Amino acid sequence: MRLAFQLSYDGNQFRGSQLQPAYRTVEGELITACQRVQLFDDPCKAGFALAGRTDRGVHARGQVGAFSTPFPERAVEALNGQLSPDLWCNGFAEVPPSFHPRFDAISRTYRYFFADWPLDIRAMDQAAAALIGTHDFSRLARVREKSPIRTVKSARVFQDRGIPVFEVTAHTYLWHMVRCMAAALLLIGTHEREPELMERLLSGKCRRNPPAAPADGLVLWDVDCGVTFTPTEPDPRSRDWIGSARREAMVRERIIGLLDRSGVDRRGKEPGDDSGRDLL
């Protein structure tokens, strides 16, 4: 039987999601947990896959994974029983044998939690609206793919219990695309740039790209694969640190603390970095 799982993780202690020998990754932890309880031996033969890759330090609330196993009845309980406290399963569903979370994904939604306040939310939301539609995102990403053209379905900036949040939904993204968009919005929110900056970036009229915002504020919020998940029993170790009542305090502590330790100021720039001024 093929099963799909909705997964959450705190990305701080992972070297990204993709399997890498000698490093702790989300895929590595999941595969090891499955093999430990003999859900499968070979991840390739089991068709193990995730819906999307996340970089080092990026978190997830709604990542989707899938694999095939001859022991579906014990898969759900076994997974949460074997996983570490910073990685857990929120839901599961039986899916067709051909289901692949990456290729069957209809859309992926990210949220970026800003460690800066107050910000001009109205100006940021106005600028975010310019992202909607099909554009060349060369100036808002690090382009590795053949085409820099992507289509954004929705984009908005709002406050959630006092924390400024940028939410964007698209089918696929370029590398660092969301973090570069967040960095540009931050320049607008701090009044270092006008909302028209976003349109100038999309039209290619700016001389350089904005630097990518720190990874620690980024959350893979949801992946829509057209699957309805059955919620799992709450695991006592699981910490819905982005969705719980403690989220605000934890986001402030995690993100600001990490920025302070990394020498990045609260505008997401290295000390002395005037890259925001050089955009135009």
Curated annotation (Swiss-Prot):
Could you tell me which PANTHER family the record lists for this protein?
PSEUDOURIDYLATE SYNTHASE, TRNA PSEUDOURIDINE SYNTHASE-LIKE 1
Q: Where is the active site?
A: 55
Q: Which UniProt keywords apply?
A: Isomerase, tRNA processing
The family annotation for this protein states:
Belongs to the tRNA pseudouridine synthase TruA family.
Question: What GO annotations for molecular function exist for this entry?
Answer: RNA binding; tRNA pseudouridine(38-40) synthase activity
EC number per UniProt: 5.4.99.12
Which NCBIfam families does this one have? hisT_truA
Could you state one GO biological process linked to this protein?
Answer: tRNA pseudouridine synthesis
- Domain of life (superkingdom): Archaea
List, alphabetically, the CDD domains matched.
PseudoU_synth_EcTruA
**What does this gene product do?**
Formation of pseudouridine at positions 38, 39 and 40 in the anticodon stem and loop of transfer RNAs.
**Catalyzed reactions:** uridine(38/39/40) in tRNA = pseudouridine(38/39/40) in tRNA
Write down the species.
Methanosphaerula palustris (strain ATCC BAA-1556 / DSM 19958 / E1-9c)
This protein is called what?
Answer: tRNA pseudouridine synthase A
EC class? isomerase
Amino acids binding substrate: 110
Task: Please report a single Pfam family linked to this protein.
Answer: PseudoU_synth_1
